[in-house]
Amino acid sequence: MFKPELLSPAGTLKNMRYAFAYGADAVYAGQPRYSLRVRNNEFNHENLQLGINEAHALGKKFYVVVNIAPHNAKLKTFIRDLKPVVEMGPDALIMSDPGLIMLVREHFPEMPIHLSVQANAVNWATVKFWQQMGLTRVILSRELSLEEIEEIRNQVPDMEIEIFVHGALCMAYSGRCLLSGYINKRDPNQGTCTNACRWEYNVQEGKEDDVGNIVHKYEPIPVQNVEPTLGIGAPTDKVFMIEEAQRPGEYMTAFEDEHGTYIMNSKDLRAIAHVERLTKMGVHSLKIEGRTKSFYYCARTAQVYRKAIDDAAAGKPFDTSLLETLEGLAHRGYTEGFLRRHTHDDYQNYEYGYSVSDRQQFVGEFTGERKGDLAAVAVKNKFSVGDSLELMTPQGNINFTLEHMENAKGEAMPIAPGDGYTVWLPVPQDLELNYALLMRNFSGETTRNPHGK
């Protein structure tokens, strides 16, 4: 049966290596200055070449993201800066701006181009247009339903399509947001988003003054035990002022229409339950978001979605335990996004803007060093003798209770204190530990309070 590509994020070479070790078929990484993760991008030209070479040596693919919305100044140096990247031999460029796409088609006509999600492709005519422009794949907008994706697949059957299946969602249409730029002059479309949508805001009632400006009313609004009711009833005729917690006294106006108020913090996408249907549709690539995430995130998401894809291709039923495994990653709550239609409160997290897990915490990375039955672990977070742990490897996972660990001198250690320490754990000598990771299973704790009930 047809098997879609599993495409993982690579914010660093280490993330790339873990993604490949745990089953990714391809990774994507940003070109310096021209992608939307310029603040969190390890990749310079040297690392790009290393990554491309390592991917190809493994029979994998490496895509370079060039999806910035450029102003004129960026055009002056674009071809000069891109030429050495093209010469490295990436498998495709991921692009959104029609002008930059035109320049690449003119100067590097053999270079495959994938249309970025930033281009907002939401219908089959758009996909067909970009096919006629010579692109080889379109990454569809996250705002599409399963039925819309299937119609696009049927209308343009000879064009590759790619779908996001996991990771953060943006409050704006395919990430075309102005909020960060408006509040603190960091333009998301130039790769410097500060995730202002995740911040804590206070909402206070305002009023319209004599000349039509929205001004502060200076009267508190009593709010107690309010449940989200978006999509129910008529929109309010009130206007409101938003105050971000770290910017007291700075107010922005907010309105409500028939869709609700746009505040503002989306849950994370988790579409693993739909991998089987997307596979049957013939979607060519299933993509995981997260170029700013950890190597543990890259490893775990690759492992879980690898199994889901393999099971779907083999005709096996969906393994619901994979949903629980993904709960072990810190997240903002999960949603299926727009793949199936929900009420608005299923999309949004109204309680907090940070990522958290009440199932597991990543606590250590096996270094590869061994002393007999002991293996070295570089500690990342605190754990103790008696804890329930999971040892995760590309070959499979093992849950166990930690009964003993030592320091480098062979002295017993009841506690691995935290980042910067190395401890030695008993591990069978025949167990392969390349890319092995260690997680602590919670019992009433969370990653926000990992050692308190």
From Swiss-Prot:
Keywords: Hydrolase, Protease, tRNA processing. It is an enzyme of class 3 (hydrolase). GO terms for molecular function: peptidase activity. It comes from the Bacteria. PROSITE patterns: PEPTIDASE_U32. GO terms for cellular component: cytosol. GO terms for biological process: proteolysis; tRNA modification; tRNA wobble uridine modification. Its EC number is 3.4.-.-. Disruption phenotype: Deletion mutant cells display reduced 5-methoxycarbonylmethoxyuridine (mcmo5U) formation in tRNA(Ala1), tRNA(Ser1) and tRNA(Thr4). Reduced 5-carboxymethoxyuridine (cmo5U) formation in tRNA(Val1). Strongly reduced cmo5U formation in tRNA(Leu3) and tRNA(Pro3). Cells lacking both trhP and trhO show complete absence of 5-carboxymethoxyuridine (cmo5U) modification in tRNAs; cells display a temperature-sensitive phenotype and decode codons ending in G (GCG and UCG) less efficiently than the wild-type strain. InterPro entries: Peptidase_U32, Peptidase_U32_C, RNA/ubiquinone_mod_enzymes. The keyword tRNA-binding does not apply. Changing C193A: Reduced 5-carboxymethoxyuridine formation in tRNAs. Belongs to the peptidase U32 family. Involved in prephenate-dependent formation of 5-hydroxyuridine (ho5U) modification at position 34 in tRNAs, the first step in 5-carboxymethoxyuridine (cmo5U) biosynthesis. Involved differently in ho5U formation in each tRNA; tRNA(Leu3) and tRNA(Pro3) are major targets of TrhP. This is tRNA hydroxylation protein P. It comes from Escherichia coli (strain K12).
